[in-house]
């Protein structure tokens, strides 16, 4: 969110959209996740066509998920920058996870076991990606560094 504020970009969150879809009574499952990605892709494309920069908050752990954003960029002529935020210190990662509350009703906060499972299945990147290890950085420091890096590209 901070990067979007710093850059004047539109912020779109997969989890917020998924939470809204689940609030409509649809059963949780991979189909809802795909629907959330496709919904955000459509919103991103509309905003890109209007000339807005877009920051999408998504895990993007698979090639299929990443292709969603390549498609949006190709359809709109926009450039794309993938950013991977990670926490190399496992204890710090667990600490942050235990204190996390995104105020979502239907999309729960992941457990440490969920994070470990997802990490095991995380697809290698085929794109150029800006990677930030946030283990020793505060959120605003990460956002400032990321904003500075993106402004030079």
Predicted regions and their residues:
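Short, hydrophobic alpha-helical segments
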Residues: 48, 150-153
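Conserved phosphate-donor/acceptor-positioning beta-strand/loop module used by diverse small-molecule
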Residues: 76-97, 132
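Glycine-rich phosphate-binding loop used to anchor ATP phosphates in small-molecule kinases
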Residues: 31-80
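Small-molecule kinase domains that catalyze NTP-dependent phosphoryl transfer to phosphate-bearing small molecules
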Residues: 100-145, 152-153
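Hydrophobic alpha-helical packing elements
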Residues: 36, 65, 93, 138-142
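Hydrophobic anchor at the start of a short beta-strand
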Residues: 9, 54, 80-81, 129
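Conserved nucleotide-binding/hydrolysis micro-motifs of P-loop NTPases
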Residues: 16-18, 61, 86-92, 136-138
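Conserved substrate/cofactor phosphate-moiety recognition/catalytic segment
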Residues: 1-52
């Amino acid at each position: 969110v901070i990067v979007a504020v710093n850059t004047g970009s539109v912020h779109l969150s997969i989890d917020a959209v998924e939470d809204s879809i689940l609030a409509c009574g649809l059963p949780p499952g991979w189909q809802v996740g795909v629907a959330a990605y496709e919904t955000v892709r459509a919103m991103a494309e509309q905003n890109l066509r209007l000339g807005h920069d877009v920051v999408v908050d998504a895990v993007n752990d698979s090639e299929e998920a990443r292709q969603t954003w390549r498609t949006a960029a190709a359809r709109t002529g926009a450039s794309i920058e993938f950013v991977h935020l990670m926490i190399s210190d496992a204890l710090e990662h667990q600490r942050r996870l235990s204190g996390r509350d995104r105020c979502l009703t239907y999309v729960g906060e992941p457990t440490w076991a969920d994070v470990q499972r997802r990490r095991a299945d995380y697809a290698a990147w085929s794109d150029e990606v800006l990677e930030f290890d946030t283990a020793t950085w505060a959120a605003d420091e990460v956002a400032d560094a990321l904003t500075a890096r993106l402004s030079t590209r």
